[in-house]
Every structure is written in C-alpha cells, then in structure tokens.
C-alpha cells in the first residue's frame, strides 16, 4: 500500500498532463503530494523525512511554476531532488564516515563495510546521472518527452538500479554454512 501511495502523485501528475496541461498537472501534483503526506500522518502517525523533503520541493518548485507560469521550475525540481539525494549519500560516506544506505538497511543486512561504501557511492552516482539526464531532457527536448521520461524513464531506471543493487547485495551476503 505504501509503495502505491509513493507513486500516486506521479500517476496523478501524468494523468492531468495528458488531460490538460503542465500547469494543471503541477497543481494536481502539489495537491496529491499533500494528500499522501496527510494520509501517511493520519494512518501511520509518521511522515518520513524524504516524503517531507519531497513535498516541500514539490510545493516550492510547483508554486513557482504556477506563479510565474513557467514550467522550467517544475523541471528543475527533479534534478534538485536527485542532487539532494546524492549529496546526502556522499556527505554520509565522506563526512559522517558511515554510508547512509548502511544506516537505513544495516539492521536488516550484514554486509562488509566495503560493500556498503560501494553501494552508497553507486547510488550517489546514479542520482547524479539521473539529475544530469533530467537537465538534458527537460531543457533540450519537447515538454511531452520530458513528462514521459520523468514518469516512465526515471521510474524504470530506478527499478532496474534497485534490482541490480539487490543482486549486488545478494552476491556479498554472508553464506550460510549449512548448505
């Protein structure tokens, strides 16, 4: 259910874009993201930091898009979010000396420190590359191409990278000696 809720604003954005335009889609995105945040609070009495950060960025960049009637702001939101994710991952590894991915998954998975570091760095690079791809597609290709890339391309890339990360983790998990 939670994964569905995470994708709901994206689905709403896409539907409103196809039915109306980028400004209706942006308005719908802001409203849907707020509804998901409120639902999460009411249902679970908890709002994850990433969900809150995402909402703030959606509200700010979406609000600027609507106020100035300029879609460049909502296009930048994607890259800013990816830059923040990459920055948090790199900061955790290089400054805090403990990869963020390890902080998030370390209780569930026993992996060597080098694996955590590589995985953390790989995700940081992934987010940087996605952010750069977004800049290129958002500002050099037609708007409809960007919307499709944002909804389908980035979602597919993230799913594939998650799968590859899972394979990488599986290959480095301690083996049970009883088999």
From Swiss-Prot:
Task: Please provide, in alphabetical order, the Gene Ontology terms of the cellular component aspect for this entry.
Answer: plasma membrane
Tell me where in or outside the cell this protein is found. Cell inner membrane
Do you know which InterPro entries this protein is assigned to?
YciB
Primary site of residence:
membrane
Q: Which residues cross the membrane?
A: 22-42, 50-70, 76-96, 121-141, 149-169
Any keyword Cell inner membrane?
yes
What keywords appear on the UniProt entry?
Cell inner membrane, Cell membrane, Membrane, Transmembrane, Transmembrane helix
Q: How does it sit in the membrane?
A: Multi-pass membrane protein
- Role noted for this protein: Plays a role in cell envelope biogenesis, maintenance of cell envelope integrity and membrane homeostasis.
Q: Which HAMAP family does the protein's record reference?
A: YciB
Q: Which family does it belong to?
A: Belongs to the YciB family.
The protein's name: Inner membrane-spanning protein YciB
């Amino acid at each position: 259910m939670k994964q569905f809720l995470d994708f709901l604003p994206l689905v709403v954005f896409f539907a409103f874009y196809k039915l109306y335009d980028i400004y209706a889609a942006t308005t719908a995105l802001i409203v849907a993201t707020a509804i998901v945040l409120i639902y999460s609070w009411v249902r679970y009495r908890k709002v994850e930091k990433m969900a809150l950060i995402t909402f703030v960025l959606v509200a700010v960049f979406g609000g600027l898009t609507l106020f100035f009637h300029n879609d460049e702001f909502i296009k930048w939101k994607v890259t800013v979010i990816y830059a923040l994710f990459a920055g948090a991952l790199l900061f955790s590894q290089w400054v805090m000396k403990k990869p963020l991915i390890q902080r998030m998954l370390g209780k569930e998975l026993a992996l060597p420190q080098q694996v955590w570091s590589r995985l953390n760095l790989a995700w940081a690079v992934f987010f940087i590359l996605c952010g750069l791809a977004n800049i290129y597609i958002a500002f050099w290709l037609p708007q409809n191409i960007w919307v499709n890339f944002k909804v389908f391309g980035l979602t597919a890339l993230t799913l594939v990278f998650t799968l590859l990360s899972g394979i990488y983790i599986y290959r480095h998990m301690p083996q049970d000696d009883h088999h």
